[in-house]
Amino acid sequence: MDVSGQETDWRSAAFRQKLVSQIEDAMRKAGVAHSKSSKDMESHVFLKAKTRDEYLSLVARLIIHFRDIHNKKSQASVSDPMNALQSLTGGPTPGAAGIGMPPRGPGQSLGGMGGLGAMGQPLPLSGQPPPGTSGMAPHGMAVVSTATPQTQLQLQQVALQQQQQQQQQQQFQQQQAALQQQQQQQQQQQQQQQFQAQQNAMQQQFQAVVQQQQLQQQQQQQHLIKLHHQSQQQQIQQQQLQRMAQLQLQQQQQQQQQQALQAQPPMQQPSMQQPQPPPSQALPQQLSQLHHPQHHQPPPQAQQSPIAQNQPPQIPPQSQSQPLVSQAQALPGPMLYAAQQQLKFVRAPMVVQQPQVQPQVQQVQPQVQPQAAVQAAQSAQMVAPGVQMIAEALAQGGMHVRARFPPTSTMSAGPSSSISLGGQPTTQVSQSSLTMLSSPSPGQQVQTPQSMPPPPQPSPQPGSQPNSNVSSGPAPSPSSFLPSPSPQPSQSPVTARTPQNFSVPSPGPLNTPVNPSSVMSPAGSSQAEEQQYLDKLKQLSKYIEPLRRMINKIDKNEDRKKDLSKMKSLLDILTDPSKRCPLKTLQKCEIALEKLKNDMAVPTPPPPPVLPTKQQDLCQPLLDAVLANIRSPVFNHSLYRTFVPAMMAIHGPPIVSPVVCSRKRRFEEDERQSIPNVLQGEVARLDPKFLVNLDPSHCSNNGTVHLICKLDDKDLPSVPPLELSVPADYPAQSPMWIDRQWQYDANPFLQSVHRCMTSRLLQLPDKHSVTALLNTWAQSIHQACLSAA
């Protein structure tokens, strides 16, 4: 076969039409719609190909592309076949992604290549024919007959390269998938470990909380058990006291009638100093004598005598009236001696001064049964033994009784007991103040408890011992209940309902342990704090008006809402009397106002007036006026207007340098000189960095204009101005630079500017403009800067 005939045969229309029909058949089987027809694709391939082999290889690849689409319809992302052809013309790239061929196994036949084999046989791969069908098109015989062995080898090599590259891509993708799976497994393991650690920590915290709750429950149960035991002990002791009181009543009822007649003479002796109270009030008066010293001595918590350490300090209200009334009678014989001995034993530890003791006070009900009151009125002479008996019973039972006293004149000024840091009243009792317990004299101070309003109820303090009662009010001063050495009758405020009480001197000397005037009472301290508060408020009143002005000023400013709220709260504290705040808060407000003082422009108070002395300065009134007006905005103007005329009258006009007068010109010369319009227009169009003015020192009648040019450029240094002489027939003649070399001899930089300017002027053409001359000047300065750098 003639090779030249084959080379020219592929360009014929019949040959090309066969390939067009084959491409059309492949497109129809693939079922893919394209914007370009098979004829367009073939013509594109025909234009790209240079030889027959290249033309056949491109058509074969196009057919293979469509048949792969037919075999792999599941793949939707198929690239444009025309783009694939364009990428194939330059040779297969690594990866062969531009061809758009899906991967095939090594045993699968090339469907589109079957039409190019000799006699319709499929192309053998690896030397062995594959078991698949040939896949030849029915009208592809003409193409087969024209194929050469070289084309077959090229197509086989291309297919093998594509398969190898696709296999490598598959392996790489598999490796990446395996790596991603390993990373996901590691992340899952880490998350599981973190979750387990969090669960363990939460379990430990929950166990700790449960243990704490169990411990608290156990402590509460133990506390309740203790309370129950103590209440049982109190009930037992109260029953014993009631039995003793009943025995004493039975013994005393037999002796009441005989002793009533004998008790009248000793009771009439002190009646000259003190009126005898009615019989119905005898027993409460006896009780009040007992309760005087015990009211001064608050019971300590841990320093009580060994007899009363483990005894409960409370008595229920329902069991108070009967034992106290019944114990007001006397004990006969040996019981009286025993009571006195025990009373001395109880009194000994009570002498010690005990600071900071919480008073555990129990109220005593003054209600007396009618029968017991009548019996007590008939046995008035048994006051002292009855007092000793009650003291003995109180010491054995650990009870601390506080009677209801009417307010005396010493209490009207407020309680004067000294207050410790913890708010607990502290009282000091000397041994002499306790002699009223043992002295049987009936002339002691007597006060009736009937008309006194009840004291505040004791409230148990949480967190302390369960049986300790703390009075809600401060303990009364000891001096208000002790008889004074100089007796003065003190009238009770409730004299309408109670008989008058007179203070009678005690037989034994008494030393008052506490001076009420030396201890600052709560009422006095609060009065001092009130005075300090009012003084501080008066001191801060100067900030009210500036603060209001500041609030009105920034009221509409959205950025300072926080400052506005602070200022309004400060103004409320200063102006609203209902909003009372502690003194410390007021001091903090003062600090805040001091910080805002500059913003508010608080008027400074005038300086304190200077006391007139004999050597007072003559100009002191003037200095005072200056100090008063020194903050005025027109202060300098006022000083100038006031003092300059006087200073000029004294010293004369100020000395100034003489003004350099320029050469005067006549008006006729000014009228003759005019600037040409050409020059005016050029100057108006100059760069703004050039400032051009007329030279006032030159004036010529021949039409020449002298200009002074200054350079105002932020990127260039300051240099002497440029002087130009523009002729009258400008622009027919060029302007001239008036060289003043002495201005450039100041430093090396200016000398460099002068040299550059001279050299550049020589390069200008014969006819040049003012603009060209000024640009040359600026370039010379720039060149000098570069050379200096």
UniProtKB/Swiss-Prot annotation:
It is found in: Cytoplasm; Nucleus. Residues 407-426, 494-504, 512-530 have a biased composition (Polar residues). It comes from the Eukaryota. A motif (Nuclear localization signal) lies at residues 548-565. Residues 88-140, 257-326, 404-531 are annotated as: Disordered. The keyword Cytoplasm applies. The modification Asymmetric dimethylarginine is found at residue 347. Its main location: cytoplasm. Keywords: Activator, Cytoplasm, Methylation, Nucleus, Phosphoprotein, Transcription, Transcription regulation, Ubl conjugation. GO terms for cellular component: core mediator complex; cytoplasm; mediator complex; nucleoplasm; nucleus. The keyword Magnesium does not apply. Ubiquitinated by TRIM11, leading to proteasomal degradation. InterPro entries: KIX_dom_sf, Med15_C, Med15_central, Med15_N. Residues 451-463 have a biased composition (Pro residues). Component of the Mediator complex, which is composed of MED1, MED4, MED6, MED7, MED8, MED9, MED10, MED11, MED12, MED13, MED13L, MED14, MED15, MED16, MED17, MED18, MED19, MED20, MED21, MED22, MED23, MED24, MED25, MED26, MED27, MED29, MED30, MED31, CCNC, CDK8 and CDC2L6/CDK11. The MED12, MED13, CCNC and CDK8 subunits form a distinct module termed the CDK8 module. Mediator containing the CDK8 module is less active than Mediator lacking this module in supporting transcriptional activation. Component of the Mediator complex, a coactivator involved in the regulated transcription of nearly all RNA polymerase II-dependent genes. Mediator functions as a bridge to convey information from gene-specific regulatory proteins to the basal RNA polymerase II transcription machinery. Mediator is recruited to promoters by direct interactions with regulatory proteins and serves as a scaffold for the assembly of a functional preinitiation complex with RNA polymerase II and the general transcription factors. Required for cholesterol-dependent gene regulation. Belongs to the Mediator complex subunit 15 family. PANTHER family: MEDIATOR OF RNA POLYMERASE II TRANSCRIPTION SUBUNIT 15. This is Mediator of RNA polymerase II transcription subunit 15.
